[in-house]
Amino acid sequence: VTAKYGGSITEYEGAHKVPGKIIPLIAIPTTAGTGSAVTAFSVITDHSRDYKLTVFSYEILPAYAILDAELLTTAPASVAAACGIDAFIHAEEAYISTAASPFSDAMAEKAMSLIGKNIRRFVANRGDIEAAEAMLVGSLFAGIAFSFARLGNVHAMSHPVSAFFDVP
């Protein structure tokens, strides 16, 4: 956003403040947690203010997402666990959202199934490519689900707490 339109990313905080298309973005996830490779949301931690800001705009939706489970294998167990829990909660919040639909529910259900069946295995052995792939795909399904159904109180409460304590 700032590469094309300048300024500080804080100027684009909120919904629909990006003035137009950005430079085409190719997203390559290195964790299985945020789902940002398939969403129009970007959450950025401002460490100087102990604050997480959210930019929401369809203009920042990645043009392509390249999924390579090998890239997840170097994450420490603590990061793999935190990201996996985040992805599962993305799916859970989308599933119970009042804005949920049959489509978002299908994405959320598949995400919860993939993550639920693989998170312990992946955290225990990040070199397990099959588990890493399931976590990665589950995270992206969760991202699609919450893009359509939105998130809830868990994420609303977690952003200020996690920014203040500098935890994922």
Residue ranges and their predicted role:
Residues 41-149:
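Carboxylate- and glycine-rich phosphate/diphosphate-binding segment that chelates Mg2+/Mn2+
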Residues 155:
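Short conserved active-site loop signatures built around small residues
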Residues 1-69:
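Glycine/threonine-rich beta-strand-loop-alpha-helix active-site module
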Residues 160-168:
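Catalytic phosphate/nucleotide-handling subdomain of diverse soluble enzymes
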Residues 152:
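Charged, alpha-helix-enriched surfaces in structured cytosolic catalytic cores
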Residues 2-4, 94, 164:
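Active-site catalytic microenvironments for nucleophilic, acid-base chemistry
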